[in-house]
Amino acid sequence: MSNEGGVPNVVKFAFGGTAGMGATLVVQPLDLVKNRMQLSGTTGKKEYRSSMHALTSIMKNEGVFAVYNGLSAGLLRQATYTTTRLGTYAFLLERFTEKDKPLSFGMKAVLGMTAGGIGSFVGTPAEIALIRMTGDGRLPVEQRRNYTGVVNALTRITKEEGVLTLWRGCTPTVLRAMVVNAAQLATYSQAKQALLASGKVQDGIFCHFLASMISGLATTIASMPVDIAKTRIQSMKVIDGKPEYKNAFDVWGKVIKNEGIFALWKGFTPYYMRLGPHTVLTFIILEQMNAAYFQYVLKRDVTSAL
């Protein structure tokens, strides 16, 4: 389908990043709790009994505003990863959709995986900084990296550990992104299509909300095992040239052996509480910006963003 007369591709990319950054401002504390829960157990003891215990412990021991540690990295991640993935998906969706003939769920999943893989490679450096900055407070004082912000984190990582460290864990990061986007983008598009086809829901914020919640749940279940592997690899320290984990399979093996198979879904509550609202807010903001562009710039009927 041609882009002629529609939203320019550069605007689609800008909308994607803006939507992701807006959502991150709201859910950053949940992302921090999720990361802390996934790192709990790496020191040989279970640091947090639950998500609420993690949240209260962080505020008590590190201060109320500590829940926003790593915000600059979170925003940069959205500016790189989400800008690329949503912009690429919107572009591919338009490119491969024929007039009056919706794409199959399988094809949407393939496009989502492609967009996610590309976006994740671009966003991995910010992801590394985010994982380290949100996890720093759980370490003993003498072991903390104490990054002052995302620029300081990226600069120090490059200087102290080499530029390639910015892409450490890139494989599980890309794998996670492909799983997330295949589930999230395809499920959102499909759920929205089904809701509108039912005739019971009109195309608007409520429809976008329902489709987003369905998408968020499916994505959480599918992606958590990959996410915990990514989190632990990106947070690990290399001692005497020996990394704690060799690869994602090594992480899964050690987690299952030492913590049990359900530990692969450790932090499910904050993960879904973060991913659910983040998915909802991202898609609603994206759809509203898209609608406003059609109404005030193109001055014609709205065509769905995704």
From Swiss-Prot:
Membrane-topology annotation of the record: Multi-pass membrane protein
Key word Repeat present: yes
Chief localization: mitochondrion
Catalytic activity, as annotated: (S)-malate(in) + 2-oxoglutarate(out) = (S)-malate(out) + 2-oxoglutarate(in); malonate(in) + 2-oxoglutarate(out) = malonate(out) + 2-oxoglutarate(in); succinate(in) + 2-oxoglutarate(out) = succinate(out) + 2-oxoglutarate(in); maleate(in) + 2-oxoglutarate(out) = maleate(out) + 2-oxoglutarate(in)
One Pfam family linked to the record: Mito_carr
Transmembrane intervals: 9-38, 72-93, 108-122, 172-192, 205-226, 268-286
GO terms for biological process, alphabetical: lipid transport
Chain positions of Solcar repeats: 7-95, 103-194, 203-292
UniProt cross-references to InterPro entries, sorted A to Z: Mito_Metabolite_Transporter, Mitochondrial_sb/sol_carrier, Mt_carrier_dom_sf
Keywords assigned by UniProt, alphabetized: Antiport, Lipid transport, Membrane, Mitochondrion, Mitochondrion inner membrane, Repeat, Transmembrane, Transmembrane helix, Transport
Gene disruption phenotype: Viable, with no visible phenotype. Animals have increased levels of reactive oxygen species along with increased sensitivity to the reactive oxygen species (ROS) generator Jugalone (5-hydroxy-1,4-naphtoquinone). Conversely, display increased resistance to sodium azide, which is a mitochondrial poison that inhibits cytochrome c. Animals also have morphological defects in their mitochondondria, whereby mitochondria are smaller in size, abnormally shaped, and contain fewer cristae which are irregular and disorganized.
Tissue-level expression: Ubiquitously expressed, but highly expressed in the anterior pharynx.
GO cellular component, one term: mitochondrial inner membrane
Location in the cell: Mitochondrion; Mitochondrion inner membrane
GO MF term (any one): antiporter activity
Function summary: Catalyzes the transport of 2-oxoglutarate (alpha-oxoglutarate) across the inner mitochondrial membrane in an electroneutral exchange for malate. Can also exchange 2-oxoglutarate for other dicarboxylic acids such as malonate, succinate, maleate and oxaloacetate, although with lower affinity. Contributes to several metabolic processes, including the malate-aspartate shuttle, the oxoglutarate/isocitrate shuttle, in gluconeogenesis from lactate, and in nitrogen metabolism. Maintains mitochondrial fusion and fission events, and the organization and morphology of cristae.
Oligomeric form and interacting partners: Interacts with ant-1.1 and ced-9.
Family: Belongs to the mitochondrial carrier (TC 2.A.29) family.
PANTHER family, A to Z: MITOCHONDRIAL DICARBOXYLATE CARRIER-RELATED
Entry protein name: Mitochondrial 2-oxoglutarate/malate carrier protein
UniProt organism field: Caenorhabditis elegans
Gene responsible for this protein: misc-1
